[in-house]
């Protein structure tokens, strides 16, 4: 069941398809109107990138400084809205490996990126924190360094 363009009840499959197509068009339009992501660099110069959002911002800035002190250059982008606009997809396309920093257990942003963009899972590495505490710069840098050294650590809590 569905509704028609006047919000009236309908079981007409053609009307349902029309309404879903209409919603898809709105969703595509919205992606050009939402706030653009914020980049930590003027131009992407690394094959690696970090995607983060929300309350991870302050810790992420500190982590980027720590990584730079280790001579590890990683481009970074803070997502501010969904649906993702073109700049998000361009950033993803420009990088061979992306770390997705999240404060949840399930890697929801990583899953959303894969589902919406058809991105292969191997390109996206989750950096998760879900111990009830704010994520720290040390946790982020430790997880990135562990992954790059070939010794990834379990994604349980902040370390």
What are these regions (language model features)?
Residues 1-159:
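Flexible, low-complexity linker and terminal segments
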């Amino acid at each position: 069941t569905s509704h028609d363009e006047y919000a009236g009840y309908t079981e007409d499959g053609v009307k349902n398809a029309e309404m879903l197509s209409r919603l898809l068009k709105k969703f595509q339009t919205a992606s050009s109107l939402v706030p653009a992501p914020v980049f930590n660099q003027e131009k992407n110069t690394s094959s690696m990138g970090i995607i983060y959002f929300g309350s991870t911002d302050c810790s992420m800035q500190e982590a980027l400084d720590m990584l730079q002190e280790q001579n590890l250059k990683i481009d970074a982008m803070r997502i501010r809205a969904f649906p993702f606009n073109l700049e998000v997809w361009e950033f993803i396309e420009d990088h061979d490996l992306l770390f997705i920093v999240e404060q949840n257990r399930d890697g929801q942003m990583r899953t959303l990126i894969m589902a919406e963009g058809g991105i292969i899972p191997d390109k996206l590495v989750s950096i998760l924190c879900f111990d009830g505490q704010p994520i720290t710069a040390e946790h982020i840098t430790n997880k990135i360094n562990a992954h790059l050294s070939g010794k990834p650590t379990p994604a349980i809590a902040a370390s």
